[in-house]
Amino acid sequence: MNQTELQQKIKMTYYLLYQNKEQEAIQQVQELLFIFQNMIQQQTREQMELSGNFALIMQQELLENFQNADMLGMADCLKEKALLFTEFYFQTRNREKNE
């Protein structure tokens, strides 16, 4: 999944969460948790050093909100942290490819 597709999926998901469309949103959050886990595992050492624990904190917060069925918490995490993480992730990957 490329950056634009992923960011669209995140935006669609937090929109569903803010609209209280629980069933649709929960499925999307599950998929995003899996995607984020894969992205975190694929990070290079340099990416991990640059991002610090941000990616792990973002994923942990999203997972905790998911487990507690906190719709607004999940939406806020996606809107504030997940979009920022994806921007950083793809920016650093593209920079590494160009070097």
Predicted regions, residues:
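C-terminal-biased regions
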Residues: M1-E99
